[in-house]
UniProtKB/Swiss-Prot annotation:
PROSITE patterns: HTH_HARE. GO terms for cellular component: DNA-directed RNA polymerase complex. Residues 14-81 form the HTH HARE-type domain. The gene is rpoE. This is Probable DNA-directed RNA polymerase subunit delta.
Amino acid sequence: MDFKQYSPEELKECSMIEVVHSVLGDKRQATTFNELVQEIAQVLGLSQEQVNAKIAQFYTDLNIDGRFINLGENRWGLRSWYPYEQIDEEILPQPKPKKKRKVEDDGFDDYIEEDEDFDDADVTEDEDDDVEDLDKVLEDEDGDDDDLDDLDEDEDDFAEEELEYDETEEEEEEEL
């Protein structure tokens, strides 16, 4: 776009985004943000104070507008220049190779496990008492089945009440 053909009034009506789009289209190469701001100021005839007042909104608009893409290192270009696969390659940082650390010797690698046999003679009377206590606990848990039966009955009652409610509701709808 040749900006010389426009009058100063027409240029003031152009938004900064429109100017950047045409500038990038003419250059056909990615440009840093600072260079874009300088060119906009030159084309629109903005003072440094006016540029400073509008720079934050301009940067926001540049990010939001789908026609532009940030290529990293504060360089901007038109999205139409870059196929999707190429964009991924330029934006992704290169992975750094990891340094190999020397493994420290902790002394556990040399331990050889031995099969240890436990005889029944090692069982003490205290352990026998523990087994008997477990038997009592298991017997007590068998008594908890009664509570489950009560819950099943409550669920059956609820299901019957719900069925009756649904039938009553259907009859009322038929009457209408």
